[in-house]
């Protein structure tokens, strides 16, 4: 039937390119639907060594026998060790510790990301910091400061069309904006705070906005 044909197509796409995340995610989800959790885990682990991706983490968690927070932390640690220096492995550990309410370890992981990757701070990490401050201390002032900063730092990675710059959260074969085929790649979109009369980025203005928040947030850590 249609479901069997779709499964075969997912498998063919995954077999042809283990680094093609959309195909791997679709095939892993199909395996999970069939109850083949171990195969799905193995597939994601192979792809994680080549192209870690946040959507694969969500699917990986679905292969677990239990939703227990500590078990999920252990599972995520195993996955992240496959590609330990990649930013997605580091963020995966943060997300697992936050979900398990292990605030101290989550803070330690976030601080490590900042120290190891000077340009890593983006809107996603700001939101994780906000979640930590609200969850650990109930400090809404710090949480709101981080959420404010999320609006002015670089956007988190997304699927970006190489032809027109259209940005979408989930991969599509055709760009809905320009109609390009297979033009999406996973990367950070260009971030422009504003343009001056000459059409150039307002870099001084964006810096003026960012500095008070930088000072405020550093004083709060």
Task: Identify the function of each model-found stretch.
Residues 1-173, 177, 184-200, 204-221:
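Repeat-based scaffolding regions
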């Amino acid at each position: 039937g249609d479901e069997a044909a779709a499964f075969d197509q997912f498998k063919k796409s995954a077999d042809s390119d283990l680094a093609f995340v959309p195909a791997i995610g679709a095939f892993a989800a199909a395996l999970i639907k069939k109850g083949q959790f171990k195969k799905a885990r193995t597939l994601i682990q192979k792809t994680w060594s080549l192209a870690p991706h946040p959507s694969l983490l969500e699917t990986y968690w679905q292969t677990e026998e239990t939703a227990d927070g500590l078990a999920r932390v252990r599972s995520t640690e195993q996955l992240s060790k496959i590609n330990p220096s990649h930013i997605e492995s580091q963020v995966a550990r943060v997300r697992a510790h936050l979900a398990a309410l292990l605030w101290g370890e989550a803070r330690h992981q976030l601080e490590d990301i900042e120290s190891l990757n000077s340009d890593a701070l983006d809107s996603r990490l700001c939101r994780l910091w906000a979640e930590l401050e609200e969850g650990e201390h109930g400090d809404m002032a710090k949480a709101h400061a981080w959420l404010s900063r999320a609006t002015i730092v670089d956007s988190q990675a997304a699927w970006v069309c190489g032809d027109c710059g259209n940005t979408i959260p989930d991969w599509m074969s055709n760009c809905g904006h320009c109609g390009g085929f297979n033009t999406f790649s996973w990367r950070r979109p260009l971030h422009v705070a504003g343009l001056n009369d000459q059409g150039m980025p307002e870099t001084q203005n964006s810096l003026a906005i960012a500095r008070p928040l930088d000072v405020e947030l550093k004083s709060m850590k």
